[in-house]
Amino acid sequence: MGVDELSHLKFSLLLESSACNDLSGFKSLVEEEGLESIDGSGLWYGRRLGSKKMGFEERTPLMIAALFGSKEVVDYIISTGLVDVNRSCGSDGATALHCAVSGLSANSLEIVTLLLKGSANPDSCDAYGNKPGDVIFPCLSPVFSARMKVLERLLKGNDDLNEVNGQEESEPEVEVEVEVSPPRGSERKEYPVDPTLPDIKNGVYGTDEFRMYAFKIKPCSRAYSHDWTECPFVHPGENARRRDPRKYHYSCVPCPEFRKGSCSRGDTCEYAHGIFECWLHPAQYRTRLCKDETNCSRRVCFFAHKPEELRPLYPSTGSGVPSPRSSFSSCNSSTAFDMGPISPLPIGATTTPPLSPNGVSSPIGGGKTWMNWPNITPPALQLPGSRLKSALNAREIDFSEEMQSLTSPTTWNNTPMSSPFSGKGMNRLAGGAMSPVNSLSDMFGTEDNTSGLQIRRSVINPQLHSNSLSSSPVGANSLFSMDSSAVLASRAAEFAKQRSQSFIERNNGLNHHPAISSMTTTCLNDWGSLDGKLDWSVQGDELQKLRKSTSFRLRAGGMESRLPNEGTGLEEPDVSWVEPLVKEPQETRLAPVWMEQSYMETEQTVA
């Protein structure tokens, strides 16, 4: 931004502070720019004196403050003594006194009095030869006729407001009947035609910028009664009042509490209060076509009448965005459009606001278009996967190597205590090498194999089995998770009857095959104890305390002693110890049955 544009922007802020009677902001700007800027002039968009036409006119801060009735700012400017009260500027050659009279604000009498006391000339003429008293518009309401007479007397030379008010009180009062509009919706109060009221459908009052940021937001400066529906400005107590979307962060969504009657949050509410705040919001105004198009007869229409009047939309949110063809409108403040398309989302001051394609040219450079705004991508949905699917995947691990490793008793004794699988098996588990389950039979088959593997390991090494259960990836989320004791009890009852008798029969048949006997002798050398040394002795106390393990040793020892002497005709070892084992309760025979089963599988593998 160049130096000229920056100075123009700051002076526009000075004029805006004068119009709003913001004395503190006005003082800070004057001190920042220097006191000499207080008598400067800048362009101001508004109605020309004595005419309904709108346009840019050169105005000073004193003239703008007098026009809008900013009493405190006028008093401060005059008190500095750095301004010329009778200075005229603009194409109409108006002075501050002309602006004060034509503004018809509520403080017009006090403003005129301050100017007259500050040596303002009531006989000064503008470019059309009109004195300040000549630009007073005829008051169409008799309510303010007395005030108009006071203003005329002040301009005729009597600058004492108290004296004029005393003369006015001495005059007989005129009884005036005030017509009150009935509460019926179809009927309303009739007002005479007011030529001073602007046309809210044409000119600057019909532009998108004015509709979104000034319509029913800026206060009306007229002190007489007039038709509020024909006036684009807001009046005290008017239901059509809007909050400025640049100052109050609210959306175009209607407030549910306001619909019921009143909203407890007031101006701080994040939702729109009323139809004007909803449909004149920058995010929604003229983003749709009017059904009547160019034949629309509404005084204030919220929709576009032509396709070229449509304001662009955000593809992701559907709300209005800045139009690349529109720019700044100087009928508002220079900082008026530093917000984005939706009020609660503030954007940098360099971003162009949502303006219309037919907006007025701006002395300030345009900003970024909506194409440069960052695209808002909706977040991807993080939905939890199927528990059944995750349970099946955890069971689809290939246990072929682990099952093969169980064929050797030495591998069982050397298995690491910290992991239920070998290192290669754990790598496959972490890598996620899965195969899809084709049927429920595969699923349940995998479950049986996995459970059987854990049961066998629990028999050989209880500590290893407990570690594997605590680190199992399936234990938490599997649909088939059950109590381990219930699984052991149910399966032990089923296999005990089938395996115990077949174990005895296979053992008897094994003794009649010398080739198998020699191979079995080599493979079962480590079955006696953990250190590999066979213990053939059986003590009485050991038989009572370790009945199952001792009997298993005796069983192994019997085979070791029988197999080498098969050809000598020695008698077979006594296996009557199995009979009481089969008749024992389920809890007592559980471990020996599984030990026998493992032993039989070892024999089958060797064979």
From Swiss-Prot:
Keywords: ANK repeat, DNA-binding, Metal-binding, Repeat, Zinc, Zinc-finger. The keyword Iron-sulfur does not apply. One of its GO terms (cellular component) is P-body. GO terms for molecular function: DNA binding; DNA-binding transcription factor activity; RNA binding; zinc ion binding. InterPro entries: Ankyrin_rpt (IPR002110), Ankyrin_rpt-contain_sf (IPR036770), Unkempt-like (IPR045234), Znf-CCCH_4 (IPR041367), Znf_CCCH (IPR000571). A zinc finger (C3H1-type) spans 254-276, 284-308. Residues 349-361 have a biased composition (Polar residues). Residues 161-193, 342-363 are annotated as: Disordered. Residues 161-178 have a biased composition (Acidic residues). GO terms for biological process: regulation of DNA-templated transcription; translation. It holds the Pfam family Ank_2. ANK repeats lie at residues 57-87, 92-124. It comes from the Eukaryota. PANTHER family: UNKEMPT FAMILY MEMBER (PTHR14493), ZINC FINGER CCCH DOMAIN-CONTAINING PROTEIN 66 (PTHR14493:SF87). This is Zinc finger CCCH domain-containing protein 66. It comes from Arabidopsis thaliana.
